């Protein structure tokens, strides 16, 4: 299951980067989970990017600034939500919304007009906790 799902996710990542996913976004985010430290989960996420594309990888994603998040979706290719358990339950609706966005609209600094940019980024995450998402 993991290999098939990961393969499908990687196809979605490539489609997102190539601009082939204009009608829908890559709304799936694989989560690497191990209770033990030192399993190199974060390192695995980082090496998914080819050396030439490492400037388009980020592992600092702050959900408190929604406009900043939207800009990162247009600037980066892979966003690692490292230590996913640090995000609060109240932030999950905003994250879900961000993961489903296909086109981004925001005003850049010192500009009066809004920019419309395609979403490039896909998500991946890591955690040491196994009970990450719970529905009430």
Write out the residue ranges for each language-model feature.
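P-loop NTPase catalytic core of nucleic-acid-dependent motor ATPases
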Residues: 1-75
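Charged, alpha-helix-enriched surfaces in structured cytosolic catalytic cores
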Residues: 5, 89-90, 118
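Conserved nucleotide-state-sensing and coupling region of NTP-binding domains
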Residues: 29-31, 85, 112-115
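Hydrophobic/aromatic beta-strand patches that form the interior of the parallel beta-sheet core
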Residues: 30, 79-80, 122-124
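Short, glycine/serine-rich, charged loops/turns that create anion-binding
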Residues: 37, 128-130
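AAA+/SF3 P-loop NTPase mechanochemical coupling elements
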Residues: 68-74, 107-126
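Conserved AAA+/SF3 P-loop NTPase catalytic/coupling segment centered on the Walker-B
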Residues: 76-99, 131-136
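Conserved catalytic/switch belt of AAA+ P-loop NTPases
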Residues: 92-115
């Amino acid at each position: 299951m993991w290999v098939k799902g990961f393969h499908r996710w990687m196809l979605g990542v490539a489609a997102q980067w190539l601009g082939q996913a204009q009608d829908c976004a890559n709304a799936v985010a694989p989560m690497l989970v191990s209770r033990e430290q030192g399993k190199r989960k974060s390192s695995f996420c980082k090496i998914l990017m080819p050396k030439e594309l490492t400037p388009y990888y980020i592992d600092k994603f702050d959900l408190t600034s929604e406009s900043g998040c939207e800009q990162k979706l247009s600037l980066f290719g892979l966003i690692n939500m490292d230590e996913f358990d640090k995000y609060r339950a109240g932030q999950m609706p905003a994250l879900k919304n961000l993961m489903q966005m296909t086109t981004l609209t925001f005003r850049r600094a010192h500009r009066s007009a809004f920019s419309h940019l395609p979403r490039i980024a896909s998500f991946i995450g890591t955690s040491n906790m196994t009970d990450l998402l719970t529905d009430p």
